[in-house]
Amino acid sequence: MSRYAQQPLDFANLKTVSLEERGGKVKVADFAAPYQPGSGVAGLLDSLPHVLAADSFRAVVDALALARRQERAILWGMGGHVVKCGLAPVLLDLMRRGYATGFVLNGSAAIHDFEIALAGHTSEDVEAVLPDGRFGAAEETGREMNQAIVEGVRDGIGMGEALGRALDQRDQRGGRNRAPEFSLLLNAYRARVPVTVHVAIGTDTPHIHPAADGAAIGSATHRDFRLFCSLVTELHQGGIYLNVGSAVLLPEVFLKAVSAVRNLGHPLAEFTTANFDFLQHYRPRVNVVERPHAASGGKGYAITGHHELMIPLLAAALIEKHP
């Protein structure tokens, strides 16, 4: 006999309902279908189950297609690993197909892209060079980027445009770039697709170079923030903002832009946001997926996966289903 004062409840009189009456949120009509050989990416997409992330992924594909059809903004916010994963050719192809009306980079993404154009390689072995202080000390990267920024401020242009222009001018002087065809900064500049670069002083390696000019860096990135706010106004009613691989800086920049745009009286509602990353972090979730849609309609999606898999898959789905 139990020594506890409490006795187990008797379920004899518990009221039950029929399974038919209860129903269910998951139905066989929502199940996946086996992949059919030769059906391509479009067939694969159609074969996915109609649940959770699969539905979210399809919704992002449809939102991108709708934004292009309605000539609304398609803005790609990206961290450095998107560039380091070798995705520039995929993104540039999407740009040429009308699936990118602007690129929004943090400092890391800009550095890696600039180095790819300059030298055909990027990304240091930090553990190998940090002990003796060589990390971030590349001469050409620091010199060329800082010079471009200073000249851009002098000429009244932002950081993204200044970096793209500098790479273009290097090519015009005799093909000094090793891999210009792989640069977002350069090819977007040539296509007149805006690129904005958003930095925090001290987070990026060019900031420790002797040529770094804090006033110029601040002025250039602030101008780009104002330009980004202008791009955000074009999200209204049908645009889409994708945050890919920036866990803190760009989600904060985006939220401030949304607030500034609305504060200035621009309508901003009924647009789509999506966060792509291999982990779903707090700030992208609240600042990109959730808060911008409070009391304003629209929808936010969180897609979890590695950039080198998810972005080519997204591009392939767009090309096959909405060429």
Where are these regions (language model features)?
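Conserved mixed alpha/beta catalytic, RNA-binding, or beta-rich assembly cores of soluble enzyme
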Residues: 197-234, 238-239
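Glycine-rich phosphate/diphosphate-binding loops that line cofactor/substrate pockets in enzymes
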Residues: 59-73, 187-191, 230-237, 322
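N-terminal amphipathic/basic leader segments beginning at the initiator methionine
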Residues: 1-36
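N-terminal, Lys/Arg-enriched amphipathic/low-complexity engagement segments
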Residues: 29-65, 69
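Short glycine-rich or small-residue beta-strand-to-loop segments that form or flank ligand, phosphate
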Residues: 72-82, 103-105, 240-245
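Ligand-binding beta-strand-loop-alpha-helix segment within the catalytic cores
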Residues: 124-192, 196-197
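A generic, well-ordered mixed alpha/beta core segment in the N-terminal half of proteins
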Residues: 86-150
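C-terminal functional extensions of proteins
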Residues: 227-230, 237-240, 247-323
